[in-house]
Amino acid sequence: MTLIDEIRVKFKTRNYEFSKHAVDQSIIRDISVAEVEDAIAGRSEVIEDYPEDKYGPSCLILGYTKGGRPLHVQCSYPSRPLIAIIAVYQPDPDLWIDFRIRK
């Protein structure tokens, strides 16, 4: 099973938690929990991998809500009992090529 498939399973079974930072970001940026779930469950892909991240391995996922809104979700690897959602934001097209590659 691929990394994104393992993450999708954790999300489907609601085995995830939001960090305080991710909660704050989602409120400020008007991103709902349902949108984050949609973005992971739908056509999503790991676009950056951070195996040596400061607080443990994590990755950046690009996904789209049911309404087509692109979201970036940084989360821990699925090896933890609960995936930690570290950051959530709508990528700025001025900073990203196709929301996948940093300019």
Protein language model annotation of sequence segments:
Residues 1-103:
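Ribonuclease/tRNase effector modules and their secretory precursors
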